[in-house]
Amino acid sequence: MRDADGKDISGAGIRRRFLEFYEARDHARLPSSSLVPEDPTVLLTIAGMLQFKPVFMGQEERKVPTATTTQKCVRTNDIENVGVTARHHTFFEMLGNFSFGDYFKKEAIAWAWEISTKEYGLDASRIWISVFREDDEAYAIWRDEIGIPENRIKRMDEADNFWAAGPTGPCGPCSELYWDFHPERGVDGSEDLDDDSRFIEFYNLVFMESVRDTDGNMKPLKRKNIDTGMGLERMAQILQGKPNNYETDLIRPIIDAAASMAGISYDDADDATKLKLKVIGDHTRAVCYLISDGVLPSNVGRGYIVRRLLRRVVRCGRLLGVKAPDGAGAFTPAIARVAIGLSEACDANVLKSSQKICDELEREELRFATTLGRGEEILADMLAAAKTKDANAPKLTGEDAFTLYDTYGFPLDITTDVATEAGVDVDVDGFEKAMAAARDLSRDARVAVDVTVGDLLGAIADELGEPTRFTGYGSVTEEGVKVRALLKGGERVASAGAGDTVEVVLDATPFYAEGGGQVGDEGEIILSDDRGKLVVGDCRKAAGGRLFVHSCVVSEGVVGEGDAVTATVSAASRRRAKANHTATHLLQSALKMTIGEDVSQAGSLVNFERLRFDFNAPSAPTPEELARVESLVNGWIGDAIDLTAEEMAISRAKEKGATAMFGEKYGDVVRVVDVPGVSMELCGGTHVKNTAEIGGFKILSESGIAAGVRRIEAVSGPGVVDLLQERDGTVKALAGSLRVPPEEIAGRVSALMEDLKTSQKEAEALRGELAVAKATALASQAIDAPGGAKVLVARMDGVDPAALKAAAESLVAALGDDVAVVLGSGGDDGKVGLVASFTEGVQKAGGLKAGVVLGATAKACGGGGGGKPGFAQAGGRDASALDAALEDAKKTIVDALSK
């Protein structure tokens, strides 16, 4: 791609020529930094200067005096504008030249002008300049040395043309170069260079010349710096003569690939179709570079940005009918290969990572396709319900949005996109509240031990000398043990009676104390001769692990220090805990075998109901991988493998290859739990003797909880039976309510949904017919305005917006050629519906516009809205103001027609 002078104006050529221009002026060409910045305060690399920020801030010494780069950047703050405007992107390249205490303002301006007009050949008469209002030096250089006429140099305020790293630190004025797409318009109306249809900023020069202190005072920098940025996509648009950045050779090939896979032509497409193709082109570039830099799809941080962008690509592709080349599977990898092919001159690592990128895209797309199909149908019903509830200002509740997210995995941003397209608002605040409430419910309720109690228990341990002896590996009952200490309300007591909540220390116990992710045992402590009983709800370690402390309620009798007791763990609870704990070990091994040896534990919870396992993984397991994990665990359960547990030196355990538990600290002697051929871990928890005792294993859910951290929740043993019984009960209850066999439930529900939709449509049609009938009765109330026009302004309560529209249309048809109709409806809830319909004759005769008249009426009713000159709809929140508002509307119309 070359211009009239034979110069390369392709995206690659523009990039190469920029770098070579500054290399010829003694700038060191440096590589682009990663999209994952070293600066912990920034999520993604958003500017070319970011890799040099420590130098500009005086935190690092410069390695070179001057530099030039092409920096890959990602910004998502304007994601909703992608494809809408000519130049908004998520991914873009920023060409830059930098000076670290070397050259300054005069050279930076001269070179910016030279590369723009000489190297790139831009028409000097079409370049406009902005400077900071107080930067007389830059103004003079542009005017006197470069020769820019004063009427093409604009002084801007601090908000537009002054850069600062923060409230304190380096700062300085900016100067920007703008390209004029329409010089024929002259200088009028261009005072602020803010007409996006005419001007585009393509080069920004930052002159870091001051440092601001905490009092806001600015002093000159000892070493002045230059930071510049030229948008590659913008310069390509200018040089290639394209109407927008998307049609340059940097993005258009990606768009054309998507269009071809959808069987359409971009050039022949309507605006809505072009918008979706632009989103695909832009977002595909972004996700390719992000994944290449190690950012994988997840629900947190940078990973969520990748997931969000990719899901927008998938949804746009589905709406356009984009198909994979082979007609099946994921389509995103094929489009990504085009973007990857365009990447080499910007970042060669993208091409090297092509297989990784395509694998991630395919995995994520296929997972999301299932979610999208299920969620779209449910969301459609929710949006229809929202419109039925309030047609004037329909809003999807936060609870519904959260249900879509929590139950069906439908992300909020996609919900918002779909709702916006349907004209429905989303209660985002309500969604966040529902999310917070769910987190509160799921958070483990653990009461922190008061510091004073901890000190007291430490003193008790010192007094007793011997630590609590744990006997729970071999038995769930220990007879003849003694009560060594009693605590009540944080204080040591000699005895406690029925109803008291106490903490009990025994000299020996079968109760497992919480640790290694496993909860403490529950059970009971019985006094000798059955003189009393304590119900144990938990057991924990205290005093540096020397004491086992039992949390109890005295249910019968009186217990005192020195009493002989029998401690018994609940056999049912222990059985569940053992099954879940051993299943956790099997789960980790299955994950390593299925996903890879790089999988490592990041946390766990084993209780009596279920197990939770957190693990590090670069990406989410696929449904097929989870199915294999589940199958492996159940296979080992079926193999009836005997477990062994042995204490040994930690050095020997490491030699044997035992895996350590996450977050645990170990002494010189450790306990190793071995499932031969499957798993070997350092673990102090309780386990089954044979895998067959687990009974069964079922994954309940898998999700992301942090960047690169996944969570699996599952049940085993009796928990599987509980799950099956619960689901069986639900199925039977549904079958009973629907009066069909269980296997016919799905079909019956689908039929009922279709019946409901049909009934709703019929009801809507009847409401429309009723409104038209009411309107016929109102026709006689029309008044004759000057000029022969008919004016009818009336109230029709109890009518929804759709029916109100039908009524207005029928009245216009019935009353003649020159008609103005305004109808209002007030409900018991205080809300107002409004509609206006003006014929063309009324519009011309009175200069009336339905949207303007109705907008004022709606405003008087505490609402808003509008429409076209001939037809408009609106709503309000104050039905008490409706009568007066309608009278004002009538007066406005009649007065206009009287002129």
Swiss-Prot record:
One Pfam family of this chain: DHHA1
Record EC number: 6.1.1.7
Stated family: Belongs to the class-II aminoacyl-tRNA synthetase family.
UniProt keyword annotations, A-Z: Aminoacyl-tRNA synthetase, ATP-binding, Chloroplast, Ligase, Metal-binding, Mitochondrion, Nucleotide-binding, Plastid, Protein biosynthesis, RNA-binding, Transit peptide, tRNA-binding, Zinc
Sites where the protein binds Zn(2+): 581, 585, 683, 687
InterPro entries: aa-tRNA-synth_II/BPL/LPL (IPR045864), Ala-tRNA-lgiase_IIc (IPR002318), Ala-tRNA-ligase_IIc_anticod-bd (IPR018162), Ala-tRNA-synth_IIc_core (IPR018165), Ala-tRNA-synth_IIc_N (IPR018164), Ala-tRNA_ligase (IPR050058), Ala_tRNA_ligase_euk/bac (IPR023033), Ala_tRNA_synth_plant (IPR027522)
Any one of the GO BP annotations: alanyl-tRNA aminoacylation
Oligomeric and partner information: Monomer.
GO molecular function, one term: alanine-tRNA ligase activity
Record remark on domains: Consists of three domains; the N-terminal catalytic domain, the editing domain and the C-terminal C-Ala domain. The editing domain removes incorrectly charged amino acids, while the C-Ala domain, along with tRNA(Ala), serves as a bridge to cooperatively bring together the editing and aminoacylation centers thus stimulating deacylation of misacylated tRNAs.
Protein name, per record: Alanine--tRNA ligase, chloroplastic/mitochondrial
Reactions performed catalytically: tRNA(Ala) + L-alanine + ATP = L-alanyl-tRNA(Ala) + AMP + diphosphate
Reported cofactor(s): Zn(2+)
TM helices/strands, residue ranges: none
Cofactor remark: Binds 1 zinc ion per subunit.
Location of the protein in the cell: Plastid, Chloroplast; Mitochondrion
GO cellular component: chloroplast; cytosol; mitochondrion
Keyword rRNA processing: no
General function of this protein: Catalyzes the attachment of alanine to tRNA(Ala) in a two-step reaction: alanine is first activated by ATP to form Ala-AMP and then transferred to the acceptor end of tRNA(Ala). Also edits incorrectly charged tRNA(Ala) via its editing domain.
Presence of keyword Transport: no
